[in-house]
Each structure stands twice: as structure tokens, then as C-alpha cells.
Amino acid sequence: MKKPVVIGLAIAAIVAVIAGGTWWYQSRQDDGLTLYGNVDIRTVNISFRVGGRLASLNVDEGDTIKAGQVLGELDHAPYENALMQAKAGVSVAQAQYDLMLAGYRDEEIAQAAAAVRQAQAAYDYAQNFYNRQQGLWKSRTISANDLENARSSRDQAQATLKSAQDKLSQYRTGNREQDIAQAKASLEQAKAQLAQAQLDLQDTTLIAPANGTLLTRAVEPGSMLNAGSTVLTLSLTRPVWVRAYVDERNLSQTQPGRDILLYTDGRPDKPYHGKIGFVSPTAEFTPKTVETPDLRTDLVYRLRIIVTDADDALRQGMPVTVKFNDEARHE
């Protein structure tokens, strides 16, 4: 065989191999499902649980935030005063409860007994005086008004005696169970108010709930804030999720736990890796923000893909291409 013919056959063979390889690669790529999504935007609005004057903010927009970091504080003074008042309330309620449990001292019982004797003497005198007035009334020596005054004095003395006797009886038998229970309930209420005052004072310090990046600083020190007013907005950096949508005919390929490749414009040849973490059980129309070659009237299912090797280059809101082909199993 002549040399030019051999060279021609070799070139033809090489071209055929390249064409076949290209066809095989493209068919392999085309066989896999491709979706389009975005890195999920996950934010937290941070606020105080109590209101007051903002005393300080320790962070600014763009700062990296660590969970547990002190972000700012309200003016403590009103809540410190409330705490002192609550502590005093507990002391008063505790003393009253202890007094109810201890009962009455011997000196108090003796004083109550003396009061009964004094009231008894006053009643006896009033009763005897009334009896004499009755005799005089019968002989028409006194007026009806004098008799009525004597009866009124007797009745008042009798009521005073009854009150003194009841008090002495209470002192001797101790406090009633109902009174003790009421004092105990008052003590528990005071303790609950103290716990709330302590919590309110603690809540004047703003603590970061998670790691992230500070997006917005909505207020400045000196502002008067209501409870729950947004002070800062935090962008959560971990974990990184990608939101994508799949139509019903491809839904069977999106089993939770399946490995996924994620491509970005900045790293077209170096994909991120992820796993399907969640498939929505309900269908919805394709959101306007999602890139798709299909009609938006199609019903789709939302996917949450957890990125397993995320880095700082993968930013929230960034568009990504999601591939389900066999490469994900071999990367």
C-alpha cells in the first residue's frame, strides 16, 4: 500500500475516533437531567424581645458574625430597677408566708386574751346598765330614747367582745389552711415576676443566633425600639442550599439523597457537589425567577439541594446549573 493511502486512512481513523468520542460524550451529557436554580437566600431578622432605648451596636454591614456574639445592647437602667422591685416583692411575700407557717407568738396570744377580758368587762357593764334602764323605763323615769341608747351601747360592746374572742381563737389554733395557701400562692407569683424581670434584663443584650454575614443595620444607637423591631438582618452562610424545580415527568429522578453536580459561571469546569435533601410534596407553577426552556404554565416541584463542599465563592442568589447525569456518581 502506498504511503499517502496509509496516511489518509490513519487520518480518517483519527477523525472517526474523535467524532465518535464527541458523539458519545454529548449523548452522555444529553442523557442526564439538567435543571436551573439559585443558591437559596436565607436571612434572619434580629430584634430585641423587649423595648427600650438602643444604647450600642457593635457590628456593621458586611461583618462576619459568629453564633453567640454580642451584637448590641439596650439601656439597662429601667430593667435593673424592675429587677430590684421584683426581688423586694419576693422578700415581702416570703416573710408573709413564713409568718403564716409559724403561727402566733405567746406574747400575741396573751395580748389577745387580755383584749377578750377587757371586752368582756365592757360588755358586762353595758348589759347591766341596759337592765337598769329597762326598769326605769317601766316606771317611766326615763325616755324611750334613753332606753334605745343603752341597748345600742350593749349591742356594740357585744360585737367588740365577739371580735376579740374570734381573734383569740385564731391565735390559739393558728392560721387557716386557706390563708396559708393564699400566702404561698402570693410567694410563687412574686417569684415568677422576679424570673420575668431577670429574663427581661437578660434580653437587653442582643446575641447572634447563628453564624453569618451582616446584611443590614436598620437602626442606630439612641433610637427608641419596640419589642420585636428589626435591628439587624443576618445572612446565614451555612448550610448552603440550592433551590431548583423539576417537572412531573422527571420527578422520579429526584430521590432524596441522590448525588448532584452544581455548575456556576465562575467555575464551569469545576462543579460543586451536593445531595437532594428535600422534594416538595406539592406542585406549583414555575416561579418567574427560575431560568427554564419550558413553558412557565407547567407545574413543577421544588427541590432543596444541600451543597456538601460549599466555599465563600458560592454566594446567595447566585444562579447554578444542576446536573443529574452519571458524572455525579464518579466525581
Swiss-Prot record:
Keyword Signal included in the entry's annotation: yes
Major localization listed first in the record, in broad terms: periplasm
Compartment list: Periplasm
Keywords: Coiled coil, Periplasm, Signal
Pfam families in the record: HlyD_D23
Disulfide bonds: none
GO CC term (a single one): periplasmic space
Gene Ontology biological-process annotations: response to antibiotic
InterPro entries in UniProt: CusB_D23 (IPR032317), UPF0194_membrane_YbhG (IPR022936), UPF0194_transport (IPR050465)
Residues spanning the signal sequence: 1-19
Coiled-coil stretches noted in the UniProt entry, renumbered to this chain: 140-209
Entry's family note: Belongs to the UPF0194 family.
This protein's name: UPF0194 membrane protein YbhG
Lineage: Bacteria, Pseudomonadati, Pseudomonadota, Gammaproteobacteria, Enterobacterales
Encoding gene, per UniProt annotation: ybhG
